[in-house]
Swiss-Prot record:
Compartment list: Cell membrane
GO cellular component, one term: plasma membrane
Cited function: Increases the activity of extracellular murein hydrolases possibly by mediating their export via hole formation. Inhibited by the antiholin-like proteins LrgAB. In an unstressed cell, the LrgAB products probably inhibit the function of the CidA protein. When a cell is stressed by the addition of antibiotics or by other factors in the environment, CidA possibly oligomerizes within the bacterial cell membrane, creating lesions that disrupt the proton motive force, which in turn results in loss of cell viability.
Protein name per Swiss-Prot or TrEMBL: Holin-like protein CidA
Residue intervals passing through the bilayer: 27-47, 58-78, 89-109
Gene Ontology BP annotations: cytolysis; killing of cells of another organism; programmed cell death
Topology of this chain in the membrane: Multi-pass membrane protein
InterPro entries named among the record's database cross-references: Holin-like_CidA, LrgA/CidA
Assigned protein family: Belongs to the CidA/LrgA family. CidA subfamily.
Amino acid sequence: MKWWKLSGQILLLFCFAWTGEWIAKQVHLPIPGSIIGIFLLLISLKFNLVKKEWIQDGADFLLKELILFFIPSAVAVIRYKDTLSQYGIDLIFIIMISTLCVTLVTGILTELLLKRKGSVQ
């Protein structure tokens, strides 16, 4: 029975992703459909249209298996050896700078939100 529940929850999450993709194609938005789907899920959770319990196990499962979703893209990088050898150092530098920026912005925003709630003194 657990697999049926898990499958249903994952299907519900994919429905949000597919709906986001459909909206992005219909409205010709420059935003990826998956982001629109996440936003739709956020709104649905915020207004209790979808209960957290309805997706919790499915989301936890997908997060646990997240590394499997990166394997195809990691393997695809091998196809571009020439590009990597030509721009490898530049790409590493860009990745390091962007990771640093994301980490800093996330940390600053988290601190601001916690101070706003009064959690941090």
